[in-house]
Amino acid sequence: MNKYELVLIFKPELSEEDRNTVFSRIQQVIDENGKLEEVHDWGKRKLAYEINYIKEGYYYIVNFDLDPQFVKEIERRCRLFDQIIRYMVVRVDEQ
């Protein structure tokens, strides 16, 4: 298993309950196939640049261990939700 970091940016008009519902669907893949390390809710922040006329969003940073074959499934689920403006999964080097 490798260590990964997932950055999620949710639309600014979403309630905390809606964000948690969407995140739980992504977390399900991690829990079934790996281990969730940390979840950081950075709150509402201004975006570095406008995305589809949206200027701010809710940031989540998620650290987890997962087999590489399941990363595609996480990316697929992130693409399915309109509530997610942007996402990025990166492998973290172990030191």
UniProtKB/Swiss-Prot annotation:
GO cellular component: cytoplasm; ribonucleoprotein complex; ribosome
Keyword match Phosphoprotein: no
GO biological process terms held by the UniProt record: translation
Gene3D superfamilies: 3.30.70.60
Key words of the record: Ribonucleoprotein, Ribosomal protein, RNA-binding, rRNA-binding
Gene Ontology MF: a single term: structural constituent of ribosome
TM ranges: none
Function per UniProt: Binds together with bS18 to 16S ribosomal RNA.
Family the UniProt entry places it in: Belongs to the bacterial ribosomal protein bS6 family.
Protein name: Small ribosomal subunit protein bS6
